Amino acid sequence: MNLHEYQAKQLFARYGLPAPVGYACTTPREAEEAASKIGAGPWVVKCQVHAGGRGKAGGVKVVNSKEDIRAFAENWLGKRLVTYQTDANGQPVNQILVEAATDIAKELYLGAVVDRSSRRVVFMASTEGGVEIEKVAEETPHLIHKVALDPLTGPMPYQGRELAFKLGLEGKLVQQFTKIFMGLATIFLERDLALIEINPLVITKQGDLICLDGKLGADGNALFRQPDLREMRDQSQEDPRAAQAAQWELNYVALDGNIGCMVNGAGLAMGTMDIVKLHGGEPANFLDVGGGATKERVTEAFKIILSDDKVKAVLVNIFGGIVRCDLIADGIIGAVAEVGVNVPVVVRLEGNNAELGAKKLADSGLNIIAAKGLTDAAQQVVAAVEGK
């Protein structure tokens, strides 16, 4: 679950980290009033969406008058911002962040993720702030400096100083950087985050460090113990189908194709999409129904897949390990009958009671195509889409 920039900065403030004074506004009038609270300009106005690349898309602007603030808010509030990180529809702009402009002398980067290879939280710092860190990692990886947090000791001040020295910081900037490093690490661990990022972390012309931007991603599996983060969730920024799937403990990611995929297991789901692509098809989604593929969850999965108007056929690929294929077949039959599926449905069952499951599908009288294997399933669903 991602947070908006203004929400990230609210958390920064709670932990004593420096950030520009700013206010999130939902109307042009609020935006003008926010400028008055901040004081004399210039100000920076930013569209609040869960996506990067806002500046290049016109969603961030430095303004010198309250009239310009009102015009920016009137132009963007209620609209959708399209960036290189969004789809063609973009993300809805429901809030504008108005904050004091900062005199920037230099831009840095500081962020942290959970590194699965080392099984630790790893902090990354770079002198190349203000640009996508992925681009820096690809083109100039030697400019990214890393430290890993020991799970027993947690973050240590010497690690912050080590990064500061590698960034070429001196004097009071080393102390300020270390404080920010320790604060970010504390936020990361106490708030069960999966990602935290300040890009850019700037050195002002006055010689101080300030968190000019903030990006936080919470671990969805830990939200049950982070009630204040749950309250910050903005479902308008999420795919409504993904949000509906999450309510049923289904993992759904929308794609651009026309073949709906329903699979149990993330690895099998990715393999299914690969083989569909291999045989000339285009997956419309990733959908993992998990180990407990009950009739109710299968029914809901069909509803979610078919809510995408692009879907011309559905491929159901189930391996019966934890669950029995005959019970899955009952769920598929009941779901197809209840939902009223009007597109071809190809089903491949393997594993526990697969033969009995295939027989139930064949005897159902419904328009369900039973596949003999994964390759056959991919070929049949692609042929069904092409009308062959």
From Swiss-Prot:
Pfam families in UniProt: ATP-grasp_2, Ligase_CoA
Cofactor binding annotation: Binds 1 Mg(2+) ion per subunit.
Record EC number: 6.2.1.5
Residues where substrate binds: N264, G321, I322, V323
Listed GO MF terms: ATP binding; magnesium ion binding; succinate-CoA ligase (ADP-forming) activity; succinate-CoA ligase (GDP-forming) activity
GO cellular component terms attached to this protein's record: cytosol; succinate-CoA ligase complex
PROSITE patterns: ATP_GRASP, SUCCINYL_COA_LIG_3
One GO term of the biological process aspect: tricarboxylic acid cycle
Catalytic activity field: succinate + ATP + CoA = succinyl-CoA + ADP + phosphate; GTP + succinate + CoA = succinyl-CoA + GDP + phosphate
Cofactor(s), by name: Mg(2+)
NCBIfam families reported for this sequence: PRK00696.1, sucCoAbeta
Subunit structure: Heterotetramer of two alpha and two beta subunits.
Job description of the protein: Succinyl-CoA synthetase functions in the citric acid cycle (TCA), coupling the hydrolysis of succinyl-CoA to the synthesis of either ATP or GTP and thus represents the only step of substrate-level phosphorylation in the TCA. The beta subunit provides nucleotide specificity of the enzyme and binds the substrate succinate, while the binding sites for coenzyme A and phosphate are found in the alpha subunit.
Name assigned to this protein: Succinate--CoA ligase [ADP-forming] subunit beta
Taxonomic classification: Bacteria, Pseudomonadati, Pseudomonadota, Gammaproteobacteria, Enterobacterales
Gene: sucC
